[in-house]
């Protein structure tokens, strides 16, 4: 539930070699990616808030869609086992990466560039705001996508008034601007870190994957820093750069100071409550 990714065994998840263990971990890791305020509402019997929540729907769709792509890719490249085995391995990897848990029972880098691309996108997306997961957060990306759609519509209809709405509630222009600023800073840090690591001799795949992994608090990156590798070979300046990327990820902590309003005496649905505007900052 903490999406930390550490294990009591050096071999990690592979130590148990148990499909049952992987399914249980997948379920609880997926739940950990949901806004905790919504999880609380579900535990107290109000499942409608969880099931009808727009961000939860997007989160579920991304997980299922990415899992389907991975399964399809494994079958096309003839790297699949039985259907159950392929489904379990794919779902586990997708959930553990999108929630920034970082457990990897398989080396997606060895599967090929197609799979690495999928998991890098999941690292960037992250799970829902109000969870312990890293990444840009789906809630912010939903607001960004809707705002982009509105701006494209205004190109044709300049006088149109189209507020960004989440679960039927309008999001103020001020909050949209702050979300755009957050995403911009996130991307700028990602680009800067990738350039520095590239200058130190890392391939573009390794530089980008390593920076994104640290920025989103994932763990495994891409190339030599993927699930089968580590960060030991990176020069000291590169390690300092990655540590700075990890510190930049603490921008997400800004939402935590406001999250207490939801968990202590304020149990309103996050996307129907005014505090949603702060949690998306």
Feature annotation, model-predicted:
Residues 1-281:
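Membrane-proximal intracellular helices of multi-pass ion channels
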């Amino acid at each position: 539930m903490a999406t930390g990714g550490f294990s009591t065994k050096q071999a990690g998840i592979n130590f148990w070699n148990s499909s049952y263990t992987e399914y249980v971990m997948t379920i609880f890791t997926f739940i950990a990616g949901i806004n905790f305020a919504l999880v609380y509402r579900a535990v107290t019997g109000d499942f409608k808030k969880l099931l009808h929540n727009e961000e939860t729907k997007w989160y579920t769709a991304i997980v299922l869609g990415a899992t389907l792509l991975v399964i399809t890719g494994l079958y096309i490249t003839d790297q699949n086992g039985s259907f159950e085995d392929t489904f379990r391995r794919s779902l586990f990897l997708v959930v553990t990466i999108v929630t920034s848990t970082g457990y990897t029972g398989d080396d997606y880098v060895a599967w090929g560039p197609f799979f690495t691309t999928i998991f890098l996108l999941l690292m960037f997306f992250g799970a829902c705001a109000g969870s312990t997961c890293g990444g840009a957060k789906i809630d912010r990306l939903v607001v960004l996508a809707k705002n982009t759609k509105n701006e494209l519509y205004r190109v044709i209809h300049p006088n149109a008034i189209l507020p960004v709405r989440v679960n039927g509630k309008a999001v103020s222009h001020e909050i949209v601007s702050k979300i755009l600023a957050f995403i911009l800073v996130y991307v700028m840090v990602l680009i800067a870190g990738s350039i520095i690591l590239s200058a130190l001799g890392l391939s573009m795949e390794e530089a980008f994957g390593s920076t994104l992994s640290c920025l989103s608090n994932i763990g495994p990156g891409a190339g030599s820093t993927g699930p089968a590798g580590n960060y030991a070979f990176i020069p000291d300046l590169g390690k300092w750069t990655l540590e700075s990327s990890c510190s930049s990820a603490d921008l997400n902590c800004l939402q935590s100071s406001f999250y207490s309003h939801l968990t202590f005496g304020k149990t309103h649905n996050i996307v129907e409550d005014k505090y949603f505007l702060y949690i998306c900052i």
